[in-house]
């Protein structure tokens, strides 16, 4: 029998991406599947902290094995920003990916160093014990958006070793090499022990 795991997110893009990466290794449940309609606040100062806030909330309130993630884009020339604030970087714009990209590109105007990395932290709670997993992919921020697939900063992030952005690579390739894929692979390896 497959292990049931709740993925603590309301982000449909993340849910789809994680489901594709996990395949049939676990029975993945969404927050809707467990009738959780709470917007779990992400108030921690670190990616790991936000992931733990979400997974702890689900475990505490539903007593179900679960995991949550938080992802940040860390740009070297901006001292790691937007980091934990990546989804809401353009203040006052909510979770507006276009506004976030515009702000980031504006802040990088005239800067030579465009090195960046995407980092995902996953907090897993199994039988009340917490485990952390991390995935990192290095790359650079290009000057103009390219590509139509993916979400968030994908049109301006070009991973090391590729000429295409995440948005140009397409989901199949991205789901093999991304920061989230690397973190989920570690999660899968742990679950298969």
Curated annotation (Swiss-Prot):
Enzyme nomenclature, EC number: 3.6.1.66
Binding site for Mg(2+): 70
CDD domains, per database record: HAM1
Cross-referenced Pfam families: Ham1p_like
List of residues binding substrate: 9-14, 71, 151-154, 174, 179-180
GO cellular component, one term: cytoplasm
GO molecular function, one term: nucleotide binding
Keyword ATP-binding part of the UniProt annotation: no
Active-site residues annotated for this sequence: 70 (proton acceptor)
Cofactor(s) recorded in Swiss-Prot or TrEMBL: Mg(2+)
HAMAP family, A to Z: Non_canon_purine_NTPase
Subunit record text: Homodimer.
Family per record: Belongs to the HAM1 NTPase family.
PANTHER family cross-referenced by the UniProt entry: INOSINE TRIPHOSPHATE PYROPHOSPHATASE (PTHR11067:SF9), INOSINE TRIPHOSPHATE PYROPHOSPHATASE/HAM1 PROTEIN (PTHR11067)
Protein name: dITP/XTP pyrophosphatase
Source species taxonomy: Bacteria, Pseudomonadati, Bacteroidota, Bacteroidia, Bacteroidales
